[in-house]
């Protein structure tokens, strides 16, 4: 299942309670001083802080019912299972098709696969060129250069790799200021392992990919 925000009452999908310290430290006097100092820093670190943090951000992420779940912010308040997220990306990996049914036209797939922007990103991507597609970015990691998708707050992500016909969903419920850098970098070490392992097995075809996507 996949929901844009809190699932409706009666839905079989429920919100997993978040773990970690969330971003509570960002709202303390010490945390505010630290973030304000980092925001003024030159280079990639300062750019990332300015792009992500604003005073009061931590308030919408805390509690048993985080207010962010009342927004329609997919990269921050999406609620889904790994299988649901992988299924969402399956048409992007399989020429617009799922189980023989077309969801995206050939023209739409060509447009989505086309890279629209090659310039380095001066914000969250630490001046690396994320190579933006239509709403998706590449994952510039070993073995994943043909893949694209989107990463969300905390490090959950969805990905499609048209070359192998593989879609991947990775979700978790940890959000902690002390580990957010590592968690957001998860694709950098996880994707090479997944893609290299599946391709090396020699047992994965485009027809099989949707079944093992999650």
Predicted regions span which residues?
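Catalytic loop of the DD-peptidase/beta-lactamase superfamily, centered on the K-T-G motif
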Residues: 1-214
């Amino acid at each position: 299942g996949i929901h844009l925000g809190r699932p409706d009452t009666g839905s079989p999908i429920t919100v997993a309670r978040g773990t970690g310290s969330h971003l509570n430290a960002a709202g303390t006097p010490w945390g505010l001083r630290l973030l304000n100092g980092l925001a003024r820093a030159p280079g990639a670190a300062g750019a990332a802080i300015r792009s992500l943090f604003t005073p009061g951000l931590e308030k919408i992420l805390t509690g048993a019912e985080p207010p962010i779940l009342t927004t329609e912010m997919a990269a921050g308040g999406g609620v889904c299972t790994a299988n649901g997220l992988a299924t969402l990306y399956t048409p992007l990996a399989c020429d617009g098709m799922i189980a023989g049914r077309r969801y995206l036209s050939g023209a739409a797939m060509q447009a989505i696969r086309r890279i629209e922007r090659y310039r380095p990103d001066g914000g969250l991507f630490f001046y690396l060129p994320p190579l933006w597609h239509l709403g998706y970015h590449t994952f510039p990691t070993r073995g994943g250069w043909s893949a694209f998708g989107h990463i969300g707050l905390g490090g959950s992500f969805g990905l499609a790799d048209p070359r192998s016909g593989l879609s991947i969903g990775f979700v978790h419920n940890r959000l902690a200021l002390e580990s957010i850098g590592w968690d957001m970098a998860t694709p950098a070490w996880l994707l090479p392992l997944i893609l290299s392992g599946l391709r090396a097995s020699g047992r994965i075809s485009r027809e099989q990919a949707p079944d093992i996507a999650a």
